[in-house]
Amino acid sequence: MKTLYSLRRFYPVETLFNGTLALVGRDQETTGFAWWAGNARLINLSGKLLGAHVAHAGLIVFWAGAMNLFEVAHFVPEKPMYEQGLILLPHLATLGWGVGPGGEVIDTFPYFVSGVLHLISSAVLGFGGIYHALLGPETLEESFPFFGYVWKDRNKMTTILGIHLILLGIGAFLLVLKALYFGGVYDTWAPGGGDVRKITNLTLSPSVIFGYLLKSPFGGEGWIVSVDDLEDIIGGHVWLGSICILGGIWHILTKPFAWARRAFVWSGEAYLSYSLGALSVFGFIACCFVWFNNTAYPSEFYGPTGPEASQAQAFTFLVRDQRLGANVGSAQGPTGLGKYLMRSPTGEVIFGGETMRFWDLRAPWLEPLRGPNGLDLSRLKKDIQPWQERRSAEYMTHAPLGSLNSVGGVATEINAVNYVSPRSWLATSHFVLGFFLFVGHLWHAGRARAAAAGFEKGIDRDLEPVLSMTPLS
């Protein structure tokens, strides 16, 4: 009779993520993992795994510092940041360093300092990584029990979780301190076209902060991505920082409840899967944030959003034709709808033409021209400022829309600049990374659950191709 199930199911299987096998060395024979499996060889060597993590941090910080200095070296102050392929300097500018009114860069020295500090930090991390990978103790449990761990020790794992949460909370409060006391941050909504300012009136109301979480993610609602107020952003970081720190203290002081012990798989591979899942969510949220939000990601540095570029085109031609004598309030377009202005489904006065689909856009160069019922016709005739005209003309030709050969711009805009917007680049890269992190989460979660159930998913170790290959040494 043919067996319909794997006999392996009935034997306890210890994958090498479980941390119960007494292993030494870093080769195939002693770990079960070949050299190309990377850090999997170090699962039960806490000292060496620490070295790998510290060295990895060093590589990350080295890239940040080197790329930072590369962007500073190539930066042209006369051109907008978003036209120069910059992805790091916009973040520094958003934090208020080196910029003045209108987002104009007035000093590149803070950017240079940032790059140098990251390079110095990467050297320290690099030396630490090399030390722990090559010279330090293989395991930490004996000599440094505070830093040692066993993957199945639930209490130790939640203590480590708590420490991480506290560090995240401190990071959130660093932004709060920068905004409140150390020079402020760049506010794209500051009167006259944006400026650096200190945040003096934080939004701490839980109904406002947590109200964002209850919003619909669609249309004009936009969930947390719809935030358009720096007071709300910094106040949200106060809440997040407090929750992370209090949650961290909670996890350090307590042991997992019975339901948590039953619900979760407690192994190294399970923790890896949880981490990848969390990073995936972060990536998808960051993708939406950088694509749609022009407050946390000011258009002066990242370029306009797609809807913003489209609305800017309509506004630019309204300004032009109004000067040529057109009555923008009553002119009819080819479809019978208003050529320049029309009404939204809720009765607001909005721009006409194809940009009507973006009628709920909010942008600092446009909001001064709105009244209680949408765009105010009298303001459009009398109150348009030169900086609004200049900015909309610039945004009209720099839409974050591009094909594979980098030909970008609104489809109907013949003057579009051929470039890749950092907004496009950051949104796309975070979506792609978020997707692959999610796939990694599913893969490792499946393996971890299978191991907990008593069998191992993946390539049969007896049939691994590497076993038939010639050894490297």
Curated annotation (Swiss-Prot):
Matches recorded under SUPFAM superfamilies: Photosystem II antenna protein-like
Disulfide bridge partners, by residue number: none
Amino-acid positions noted as binding [CaMn4O5] cluster in the UniProt annotation, renumbered to this chain: 367
Pfam families: PSII (PF00421)
Chain segments annotated as transmembrane: 69-93, 134-155, 178-200, 255-275, 291-312, 447-471
Keyword vocabulary terms for this entry: Acetylation, Chlorophyll, Chloroplast, Chromophore, Manganese, Membrane, Metal-binding, Phosphoprotein, Photosynthesis, Photosystem II, Plastid, Thylakoid, Transmembrane, Transmembrane helix
Gene Ontology BP annotations: photosynthetic electron transport in photosystem II
Annotated Gene3D superfamilies: photosystem ii from thermosynechococcus elongatus
Modified residues annotated as Phosphothreonine in this record: 15
Keyword hit for Secreted: no
Membrane topology type: Multi-pass membrane protein
Gene Ontology molecular-function annotations: chlorophyll binding; electron transporter, transferring electrons within the cyclic electron transport pathway of photosynthesis activity; metal ion binding
One cellular component (GO) term of this entry: chloroplast thylakoid membrane
Annotated compartments: Plastid, Chloroplast thylakoid membrane
Subunit and partners: PSII is composed of 1 copy each of membrane proteins PsbA, PsbB, PsbC, PsbD, PsbE, PsbF, PsbH, PsbI, PsbJ, PsbK, PsbL, PsbM, PsbT, PsbX, PsbY, PsbZ, Psb30/Ycf12, at least 3 peripheral proteins of the oxygen-evolving complex and a large number of cofactors. It forms dimeric complexes.
Identification of the protein by name: Photosystem II CP43 reaction center protein
Lineage of the species this protein comes from: Eukaryota, Viridiplantae, Streptophyta, Embryophyta, Tracheophyta
This protein's encoding gene: psbC
